[in-house]
Structures are given as structure tokens and as C-alpha cells.
């Protein structure tokens, strides 16, 4: 559901980006411009002109790292919740599937409410909170106004000094560049692949769709804007690939360790052999004492 909700969001952003124009002074007003575009303009001017002495490429890279560090606590929390939910669902799935069948067969509203209440009890039993998965959208929602502000700053050439010092590496930051655009698209595809490895099987199809949609959107928007936006996305995607890879390794081990008590409890409750084995062990220990 979370991934599906992002599709209309991206579509709305594309329409918004296509319709706004801040290229002339008389148009540079309004809530969005004053809240997001103007601060981004001043920040880039300060980093590019004063801190890095007319190197706006380095200014954009530092800006990416700064934004990513702000988002890091939200991202780590999202990784942890995702891994915990997936591991706990492996244990709770038989019970959840049984209750969901009850919901489908329910003929009255009272029966549905009773089944849903039973489902909530199962979630509580395994310390699961499905609402936490909704927080996965939070880093995207926080970052979107920042990216959109940067988009208009670069598209409408609002940063003083950038036109005089536009070069970074092999490309001109004020013009589209096919290679940095392709790099951004490829890196976002890799990031989607890395993220999809931890998705539950039922969510894989939507994950594969995002693998295609995200790079296409990145490439399309980057070709409409200057290569500075492609640089922003390339550095951001590279950071995400590294962050996601190591977070998946760490939180996968942590989730399996924390879920182990639930697995052992489930096996004791649902595996008669383990109960008999436990009783036999107690009998043997008593005989040994005698």
C-alpha cells in the first residue's frame, strides 16, 4: 500500500514541476517560493561562493550529505521496523491467514469487527504494529520539498555566481548532461534492487514496478533541468545504496535475534513433539536424580 500511494504523489509532483516558473523577479513570491526555494537559493550561494570558493559541484555534494544525515534517524528506524515486521510475520502468518479468512467469510458487520479485533490481538501478541510501516514514507515526504526547491533554483538559474562558475568534473552544472543523468538513473535502479531484497514476497511485484518507474522519473526530470540536479540525485542514490546495504545486514541479524523468543514460544504452543520432548527430558532428569 505504501508503494502504491507514492505513484499518485510522484505524478502530482511532475505536474507541479511542469506548471511552476520562478524565472522572473515578479514571479518570485508565494508560500512555496519563500519557504523552500528562497532558503535553498541562499544556502547554495553560501556554500558555493563562500565555503567552496565558487565550486558549486562540491556545494551540491555537501548539501546532499547534510540532508541525508538529517534523514538518517528516520531511515534507520524504517529499516528496523521493516525487518522486525517481516521476521515476526513469518511466525504470525498462520494465525493471521486464518483470521483473514474469517474476515472474508464474515456476513455481518459484527463478525467482521470481531475478526478484526482478533487480528489486533495477534499483532499485540507478537508485538507488531502495522502502522509503523506508514512511517516509511516520512523520509520521502521530508525530502520532496527540498528537492523541488533545489529544482527551481537550478532550473530558473537563481543562484548568483553559478552562471560564472558552472563547471564541475566534465559537465556544466547549468545545462543538462546525458551521462550524469544516466548515472543517476542507474544508481536509483541499483538502490531499488538492494531495497527489494528484503521485501516480503507479496510486495515484490510493486517493488519491481518501482525499480522501473523511479529511474525513468529521475532521468526525465533531470533532462528537463540542469545537470546539477542529476549530480544531486547521483550522490543521493550512491549514499542510499551504501546505507541500505549495511542497514539490511545489521537489522536482518538483529531482527532474527529478537524474534527468536517468539519462534520458540510458537513451537512450544503448536508442536506437540516439542512438548513431549520437554516432558521426557523432565522424566529422565528425575530418574537420574534417583
From Swiss-Prot:
One GO molecular-function entry: membrane insertase activity
Domain of life: Bacteria
Stored Pfam families: 60KD_IMP
PROSITE patterns per the UniProt record, alphabetical: PROKAR_LIPOPROTEIN
N-palmitoyl cysteine-type lipidated residues: 20
Topology of the protein relative to the lipid bilayer: Multi-pass membrane protein
Comp. bias intervals (Polar residues): 280-290
Signal peptide per UniProt: 1-19
Key word DNA-binding present: no
Record GO biological process: protein insertion into membrane; protein transport
GO cellular component: plasma membrane
Lipid-linked residues (S-diacylglycerol cysteine): 20
Keywords: Cell membrane, Chaperone, Lipoprotein, Membrane, Palmitate, Protein transport, Signal, Transmembrane, Transmembrane helix, Transport
Membrane-spanning intervals of the chain: 56-76, 134-154, 176-196, 211-231, 232-252
Region: Disordered, residue numbers: 270-290
Keyword field contains Transferase: no
InterPro entries (alphabetical): YidC/ALB3/OXA1/COX18, YidC/Oxa/ALB_C, YidC/YidC1/YidC2_Firmicutes, YidC_ALB_C
Localization terms from the record: Cell membrane
Function: Required for the insertion and/or proper folding and/or complex formation of integral membrane proteins into the membrane. Involved in integration of membrane proteins that insert both dependently and independently of the Sec translocase complex, as well as at least some lipoproteins.
Family per similarity comment: Belongs to the OXA1/ALB3/YidC family. Type 2 subfamily.
UniProt protein name: Membrane protein insertase YidC 1
Primary gene name: yidC1
